[in-house]
Amino acid sequence: YGMRLIQFPLGIFGVALATAILPTLSMHAAKGSFDELRETLGFSLRVIAFIILPATAGLILLRVPIIHLFFEHGAFSAADTVGTAAALLAYAVGLWAFAGIRIVVSAFYSMQDTKTPAIAAVIAMFVNILLALSLMGPLEHAGLALAAALSAMMNIAILISVLTFRLGGIDWWNLGQSFGRAVIATVPVVLACLWIASLAVWER
């Protein structure tokens, strides 16, 4: 159930944007216009940051009310809500990585490179297994979710490192500035979520 909620912003924004930019990235790659490819990639990552950071804040701060609203009925008890909320929290930590992978993989596909994303995915899979075995003891099912989030972070770290080498660098300065603005823009979302989470209606 936690992954279902993560898939909502991921599918609407991450996958949709990755699909939309692939033709543009492919056109730049075919022409050898790597400056334009870097610019398009950077723009896409900045857009994702502005969307995913507030979404992450909302999912983390409102995880219990959201699960209570959508799933807590019938055989799904209040205890199940608490358990699912723990998994959702762990998944949400890696939401930026799940979304970023879609964008970065599109850049590799535009350069006719499917091998590098596949290798990175295999490495991340083994890391996921090792982390899951290590974390599911102390954290139970939330450990499995956290393992998936951490392995996604490793996946995107590998992809970004290779892509930076391939493209001769990425505009980290603009990305950093955009990330900072996204953090600032997330503050009102955080305040609103804290207010909503404090409402007594969720305790009924």
Predicted regions and their residues:
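Membrane-embedded alpha-helical bundles of multi-pass transporters/translocases
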Residues: 1-204
